[in-house]
C-alpha cells in the first residue's frame, strides 16, 4: 500500500518488494 515512487508503465518495478498496480509501484 505504500507508494514506491516508481512507474511501471514501460518497465517493471525496480525496487524489491514493490508490485505494479495501475502503472504505479506499491509496497504493502
From Swiss-Prot:
InterPro entries: Cyclotide, Cyclotide_sf. The keyword Disulfide bond applies. The keyword Disulfide bond applies. Keywords: Antiviral protein, Disulfide bond, Knottin, Plant defense. This is a cyclic peptide. Disulfide bonds join 4-18, 8-20, 13-25. Belongs to the cyclotide family. The presence of a 'disulfide through disulfide knot' structurally defines this protein as a knottin. This is Cycloviolin-B.
Amino acid at each position: 500500500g505504500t507508494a514506491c515512487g516508481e512507474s511501471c508503465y514501460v518497465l517493471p518495478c525496480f525496487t524489491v518488494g514493490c508490485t505494479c498496480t495501475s502503472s504505479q509501484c506499491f509496497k504493502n
